[in-house]
């Protein structure tokens, strides 16, 4: 009973205090500790419907974007790649790489994409239901720029297949059959490949015509 000792200079064990409280029908005040909210927890109220329904084609640029975060892993070391592509031609609009999978990674990617494309009002931005995409920060950025949020159904990667396939292609062509010696070396290779993809590998609007 540390409180009694500090406040009144009285030393008394817990059992004696309990007997006295029972005798006089006293109740101890119990302060419930508030449960800490996981900062990486999905906010259910911010989950949006799937507006694409697996229709991943569009006839004009800057109408539908697809985004996701993926792992870059090399010998136990890990980084995270956040990417936004335009579904018109599958071109990478913006990307960011970080050692931390947090809201900042996604917001930096989104803000850069908006800065590059300027007028994005009326755009649909599609993603999965990851915690960054259901965050209030993500919602606020989209709403303030006239962007409509669309989300794949929970646990359904095929609903977000363009960006999933793009990340798979990137890993296939960078991680395998290359003399990578460190995660930092891998990240450099990823950045070089993205530049190559956007300038050389991409086939423009033919991508959409094939689908």
Where are these regions (language model features)?
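An active-site-proximal beta-strand-loop segment
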Residues: 58-93, 99
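Conserved, non-catalytic sequence blocks in retroelement Pol enzymes and Pol-derived host proteins
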Residues: 6-9, 56-58, 74-75, 129, ...
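Active-site beta-loop-alpha junctions of metal-dependent nucleic acid enzymes
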Residues: 96-118
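Mobile genetic element proteins and their domesticated derivatives, centered on retroelements
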Residues: 1, 17, 21, 52, ...
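Basic, flexible linker segments flanking DNA-binding modules
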Residues: 1-60, 156, 211
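C-terminal domain-tail junction helix/linker
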Residues: 139, 143-147, 169-211
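RNase H-like two-metal-ion nuclease catalytic core shared by retroviral integrases
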Residues: 40-41, 127-129, 135-136, 149-171, ...
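Short small-residue beta-strand/loop micro-motif enriched in glycine and branched aliphatics
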Residues: 89-95, 150-152, 176-177
């Amino acid at each position: 009973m540390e409180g009694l000792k500090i406040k009144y200079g009285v030393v008394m064990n817990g059992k004696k205090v309990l007997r006295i409280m029972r005798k006089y029908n006293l109740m101890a005040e119990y302060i419930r500790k508030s449960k800490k909210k996981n900062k990486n927890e999905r906010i259910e109220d911010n989950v949006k419907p799937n507006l694409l329904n697996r229709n991943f084609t569009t006839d004009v640029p800057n109408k539908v974007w697809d985004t996701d975060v993926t792992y870059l892993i090399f010998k136990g070391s890990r980084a995270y790649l956040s990417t936004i592509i335009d579904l018109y031609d599958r071109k990478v609009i913006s990307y960011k790489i970080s050692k931390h999978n947090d809201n900042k990674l996604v917001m930096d990617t989104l803000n850069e994409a908006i800065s590059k494309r300027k007028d994005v009002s009326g755009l649909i931005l599609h993603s999965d239901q990851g915690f960054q995409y259901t965050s209030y920060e993500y919602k606020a950025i989209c709403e303030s720029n006239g962007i409509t949020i669309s989300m794949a159904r929970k646990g359904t990667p095929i609903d977000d297949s363009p960006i999933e396939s793009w990340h798979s292609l990137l890993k296939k062509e960078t991680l395998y059959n290359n003399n990578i010696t460190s995660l930092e070396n891998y990240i450099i290779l990823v950045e070089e490949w993205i530049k190559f993809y956007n300038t050389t590998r991409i086939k423009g609007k033919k991508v959409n015509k094939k689908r």
